Amino acid sequence: MADYTPMMQQYLQIKEEQQDAILFFRLGDFYEMFFEDARIASRELEIVLTARDGGAGSKIPMCGVPYHSVDNYLARLINRGYKVAICEQVEDPREAKGIVKREVTRIVTPGTIIEEQLLDQAKNNFLAAVEEEPLCTGIAYIDISTGEFWLSEIAGENARSRVESEILRISPAECLLAGSGSLTGSWEEEWLRQQNITLTVWDELPLSLERAESLLLRQLQVASLESFGLKSYSAGIKAAARIIAFLEETQKTSLQHIKSLRCYSSDNFLEMDFYSRRNLELTATLREGKREGSLLSILDESRTAMGKRLLRRWIEQPLREAGEIEERLDAVDELKNTLSLRTELTPLLSRINDLERLGGKIGASVASPRDLLGLKSSLAVINDIKKALQPCRSEILQRLAAMDALEEVFALIDASINDEAPLGIKEGELIKTGYKQEIDELRELSQEGSNWLVEFENREKQRTGIKNLKVGFNKVFGYYIEITKSNLSLAPADYHRKQTLVNSERFISDELKQYEEKILGSRERLYSLEYQEFIKIREALIPYLPRVMETAHAIAILDVLQGLAEVAYQNNYIRPEIDNSGKIRIRAGRHPVVEKALREARFVPNDLQLDRDKARFAIITGPNMGGKSTFMRQAALLVLMAQMGSFIPAEEARIGLVDKIFTRVGASDDLAAGQSTFMVEMIEVANILNNASDNSLVILDEIGRGTSTYDGLSIAQAVSEYLLENSRSKVLFATHYHQLTRLAEKLPGIINLSVSVKETGNTVVFLKKVLPGKADKSYGLHVARLAGLPEKLIIRAEDILQGLEKNKDSRPAPTLLQPLLFSDSHPVVDELKQLHIDDLSPREALQLLYQWQKMLDDK
């Protein structure tokens, strides 16, 4: 190292501590990268790789990016999975004795982004941590840009799959795992990476419970965790503390806006596994992963960034407690039926900036003057919102009418920060005139200097006779006099040449140099004083941050409720009745997304009645394109919407509270994991069988079609009987196995439904209407004709079909239904009675299905 230049030695010393990150090393107006970092950055950022003299004749690979556009380059590296260490100059180069002092001021990872340009305003950017203990698993997650900090624990039956589902619901940008955790190194690690979640194995400090509690108490600035209801959450506390320790290591500063930690239980929310969330297209479409076409895109009429993020959370975490749901419905009801209130609130909400992330920037000490002005302009409308809410009667709206307007914060910013303040904080013009006398005096002196420069320029024009003479300034030479080459002969003898340009020469004079020292001295003092005063003002806002965050949350709730009311009004939604009856009764229900996509065409509404104690299992038959999948997804979405507190598209609805929604729809190979369509299907079915309860809603679409006909039919029937025997879940099961419709004659609780078709000659019209009874045929050839298959092929297929139908009676009929699979005398029943279902993995459940199928075939 001794052969390197002093600056390069400094770089290598700092890089030694940042081996796993690309080091952005500040040199003047650029961030430079060297050695392997430079090669990586050059390739990933598509910037030129050059070389620099490192000492002793060595050439070191180098590339760089301008500091003022660093966010763009930072985003590209983070999105590609790199960590970036930001190394800044921490002293004024003019005051440095030798090499300018530099330090890593922050390490940027996917879960620690605070730059506004790198964040999606409608989505949280969570950093999560998982801590496993023998009896439970703790999950914590934080969005440092908003200050939201959550903690939970999962234990009991099927805890592992519930942990995975919860992580995927949170959808963190980054997940911290302890190196000793059982998640690490298992297939889940690669699986989570496929969900674009960066996994960071980080166990630099072994966390005892005592150490974890100490970290949290220091961050939250409280004497006991009991005030947050956390005392018994040992695994959750360790997960939360791991996050805080990681942030202390990477952010190099105290995050003053993180003063609250909220715990929750997944038992309070309607549960959906990863497959169900994906299949129902709650926040993104299944095929393209786009927001447009999802339920979120239909329900989002929010006007604020906080509201958009909260709406996403409500969709992903519907409630299970009737009282909370009714509170939300009361508020939506009142807003929907009070047009004048919505008309008044909408423009007011539109004027509110992202208070959560503004508070986060203040807490992280990165807020600019314009951020403070954004906070002020948002607070300016709070009292108008409170006034509009005063007449409201619903409980939530009454609470929101009492939100904190933070008058002290508004007054401080209004009195101190210049309304036209620049984006930066070191160029002056930050502080209002009249706020601080010393700043006013320096500003006046600086202004006098500017006036003197104008006067000096005019005087020199007269003295020299050079009409286009001008006085300018740059950081290298300071103030100068510029004369075009055509007028050089008129330059006075007391001008001293400093710089030659293509078309002009630049000079200085003794008088200008003397006044420059006075002007620049006062201006530097002014800028320095304004900077110091701004920092004081920003720090003075920190004690108010908990109140800012509370007001931000209140605005978010109001915004979501207002948006749901607007959607209900515009789309003719009705208020569902919520109870614990175990029944789902929907009259003229409509699919919220499909009906909007139809535009001109009219969506065909359908009724649905399921009863946990009576007809709880509907087998749905009929042709493809008939509307079976839409009908089933519609049922799940309407239940979900009702339990999140939204009105729903129907004429009437009674929703008995559901604890879990499961969906198995569509076919998709998981090639990356080496799993076929059928394997994926069976894993999803096993998950449903292991986890469905008496209060669950199960959606099954074409179970068993990924294998041979008899294999598929036997599995489909076995699944149906298992659900009937082992739970009272409400089930919608669409199938092409018409043999299954006979189950309704033999098993109580099963009903048949079918999608109606109008047939005229060789043409069919799919009426999209779901009616009682079974379908008499599948209309597969009609669908093939509609799809545009050659007519010659269709005619040949019809001939083959007729031949098969003539011969079907000559073949022995399948014995699947005689006797029923789960009749008391069958050996499978004996195995089931001895089986501990909760201990089965999906793979073990699948193996059992194959084993039972073989027993059936042998018999």
Curated annotation (Swiss-Prot):
GO molecular function, one term: ATP-dependent DNA damage sensor activity
Gene source species: Syntrophomonas wolfei subsp. wolfei (strain DSM 2245B / Goettingen)
InterPro entries: DNA_mismatch_repair_MutS, DNA_mismatch_repair_MutS-lik_N, DNA_mismatch_repair_MutS/MSH, DNA_mismatch_repair_MutS_C, DNA_mismatch_repair_MutS_clamp, DNA_mismatch_repair_MutS_core, DNA_mismatch_repair_MutS_N, DNA_mismatch_repair_MutS_sf
Name of the protein described by the UniProt record: DNA mismatch repair protein MutS
UniProtKB keywords: ATP-binding, DNA damage, DNA repair, DNA-binding, Nucleotide-binding
Domain of life per record: Bacteria
Record-annotated disulphide pairs: none
Entry-linked Pfam families: MutS_I, MutS_II, MutS_III, MutS_IV, MutS_V
